[in-house]
């Protein structure tokens, strides 16, 4: 039973772990006319996950997963968020994540944008890291479920060298709901298997006697079984077996009654007084 429980949990958690982030990087590109004149460039932003880095070369799909928002202004920049999946030879390119930039309040102070892990992506992995951006402060990562950002970008497969345009929309809300339901189902499966395993170990392996309520239920079941037999007009197997044993006694009694009338009368009186 414990083996079944372990394997069921492993199989149930496989779908949740197969899309885990292994290596993430975020690249910021400046759009013309967005920042003030004193801001000329944006440094590269790198977000490294706790997992080991892996290198993939196959570009498959484009999807928006998060919004990098900086409080205090409506300026926007273009964000290319690239992450690698655990699945073999699969790499996703995510583009057009919007940034709302906040200009510097104090020009002399050095400004930086910190990515606060406030939202979860699919399997619960948090986007972590720091963004050092001139003229921007108080930045945080927001889930793309609040808004849908349709993206269109070329995707290249190994068999086809030409770029093919694919359009994908964000489905973080559905993924979060699926995660919640999968967690509930896993808990129910684990509880059911655990209770059944404990019951089998206690009452079957160690042969612990049933409690009083269990014995009462067993008697009730036996009474219902006998009542059904009587209703059908038959007799239980136990009573049917006792009849052949009683027939020879009746034959012997009849022979004794025929040989001695007095004894037969006495026996008859005894039976009458007894009943």
Curated annotation (Swiss-Prot):
<keyword id="KW-0472">Membrane</keyword>
<keyword id="KW-0812">Transmembrane</keyword>
<feature type="region of interest" description="Disordered">
    <location>
        <begin position="148"/>
        <end position="173"/>
    </location>
</feature>
<feature type="compositionally biased region" description="Polar residues">
    <location>
        <begin position="245"/>
        <end position="261"/>
    </location>
</feature>
<dbReference type="GO" id="GO:0016020">
    <property type="term" value="C:membrane"/>
</dbReference>
<dbReference type="Pfam" id="PF15829">
    <property type="entry name" value="DUF4711"/>
</dbReference>
<feature type="compositionally biased region" description="Polar residues">
    <location>
        <begin position="148"/>
        <end position="158"/>
    </location>
</feature>
<dbReference type="InterPro" id="IPR031668">
    <property type="entry name" value="DUF4711"/>
</dbReference>
<feature type="region of interest" description="Disordered">
    <location>
        <begin position="234"/>
        <end position="264"/>
    </location>
</feature>
<feature type="transmembrane region" description="Helical">
    <location>
        <begin position="187"/>
        <end position="207"/>
    </location>
</feature>
<keyword id="KW-1133">Transmembrane helix</keyword>
<protein>
    <recommendedName>
        <fullName>Uncharacterized protein C17orf78</fullName>
    </recommendedName>
</protein>
């Amino acid at each position: 039973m414990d083996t079944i429980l372990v394997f069921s949990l492993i199989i149930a958690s496989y779908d949740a772990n197969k899309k885990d982030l292994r290596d993430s990087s975020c690249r910021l590109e400046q759009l013309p006319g967005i920042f003030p004149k004193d801001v000329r460039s944006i440094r590269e932003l790198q977000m490294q996950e706790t997992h080991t880095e892996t290198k993939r070369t196959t570009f498959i799909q484009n999807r928006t997963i998060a919004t990098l928002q900086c409080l205090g202004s409506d300026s926007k920049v273009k964000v290319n968020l690239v992450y690698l999946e655990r699945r073999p030879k699969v790499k996703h390119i995510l583009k057009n994540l919007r940034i709302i930039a906040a200009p510097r309040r104090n020009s002399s102070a050095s400004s930086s944008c910190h990515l606060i892990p406030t939202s979860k992506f699919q399997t619960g992995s948090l986007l972590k890291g720091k963004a050092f951006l001139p003229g921007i402060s108080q930045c945080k990562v927001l889930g793309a479920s609040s808004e849908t950002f349709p993206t269109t970008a070329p995707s290249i497969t190994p068999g086809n060298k030409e770029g093919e345009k694919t359009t994908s929309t964000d489905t973080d809300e559905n993924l979060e709901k699926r995660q919640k339901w999968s967690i509930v189902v896993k808990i129910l499966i684990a509880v059911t298997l655990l209770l059944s395993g404990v019951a089998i170990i206690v009452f079957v392996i160690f042969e612990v006697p049933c409690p009083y309520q269990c014995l009462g239920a067993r008697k009730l079941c036996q009474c219902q079984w006998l009542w059904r037999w009587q209703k059908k007009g038959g007799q239980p197997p136990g009573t049917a077996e006792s009849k052949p044993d009683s027939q020879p006694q009746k034959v012997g009694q009849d022979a004794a009654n025929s040989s001695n009338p007095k004894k037969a009368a006495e026996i008859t009186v005894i039976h009458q007084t007894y009943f």
